[in-house]
Amino acid sequence: MNIVRVDPRKDRLWQRLVDQASSGVFHSPSWIQVLTDTYGWEASAYVILDDRGEPCAGIPFCRITDILGERIVALPFSDYCDPLVNDAHSWRFLIDQLLPEHCPITVRCLHNRLPLADERFSLFKEAKWHGLDLRPEPDALWAAMHDSTHRAIRKSQREGLVVRLAQSEEELRAFFEMHLKVRKYKYGLLAQPYSFFQNIWRHFVEAQHGFLLLALNEEKIVAGDFFLEWKDTLYYKFNASLPGDLSHRPNDLLIWEGIQHGKKRGLKLLDFGLSDIDQEGLVRYKRKFGTEEKTISFLRHEPNGGPTPVEKEMRELLGKLTNRFTDQLVPDPVTERAGEDLYRLFT
């Protein structure tokens, strides 16, 4: 076996690997391009070549250097990004290329259990994942959903909500402003930069590999769902809504419309993505659509035994700054700018 380091955004070896392997959207060159365009990180991947020179395994990663120190993440701001390996020997061959960097390494696994058996990595967090098989007929998908979901969808339809595809960056901006407010006022969190969503729009929506569904009440945008597409899977990536219009139940209707869009495109799975375990309401919400549930494992290699005192202090400061900038008295444009400056540190 031979191993090479490549740029996963444009190298043909990486493209061939993700085409033939059980890859997800977070392995895709487009997603990695979104990350590097937004944050300026260097993205790389190690690829193992078989005796014929064909790619047979690989792992993408970003090396990040900032006020928190140096670290390797596979991959930042991705729900999960399993190493594309089928055996323990290939996993060790890949990760042994990164260990000599002598900095923390973070990997998020959903489908691949091989890294969990590596004693050099420790489990530091778990999250929930939900997915829905789109292959059954629409009537069967409807029947599998909870009665409360049926009622919510019918209510939104009775009240005249209309769902359509976003057509412009002006509508993308309207979605982002809802997203910013949900993050700030509901969760006390900063939002990713608007440029992140612009890059998703450019690399996915304009490339016909994703879409933004909007729910409108009397011509007013009241909610939106951002979906990405990769291979045979539709990814439910972002949701936002106006609190004052939640009584119309737009979010259930949006997902039902997303399911139907996925079926029309011939897709086989709707990936509902990551939910933190303490987000009990979100977990219950995703279960109501008849989803399968699995666990995402967050693994970390700590060559120095854990965070340095400086890193701990900086992360505490980051938490305090988040609280300050998401205070309800802070103007939303200031909160947005804080996300532009600080969100890159949440890796």
Predicted regions mapped to residue ranges:
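A short glycine/small-residue-enriched secondary-structure motif
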Residues: 62-80
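Aromatic (often tryptophan-rich) hydrophobic motifs at membrane interfaces
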Residues: 47-50, 55-58, 67, 78, ...
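A gly/proline- and charged-residue-enriched helix-loop-helix capping module
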Residues: 74-114
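Short catalytic-loop micro-motif centered on adjacent basic/acidic residues
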Residues: 106, 164, 269-273
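Short loop/turn motifs at secondary-structure junctions
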Residues: 42, 101-103, 266
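A conserved beta-strand-loop-helix scaffold within acyl/acetyltransferase catalytic domains
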Residues: 2-54, 58-68, 110-129, 135-247
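Active-site/acyl-donor-binding loops of N-acyltransferases
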Residues: 45, 63-65, 116-140, 267-347
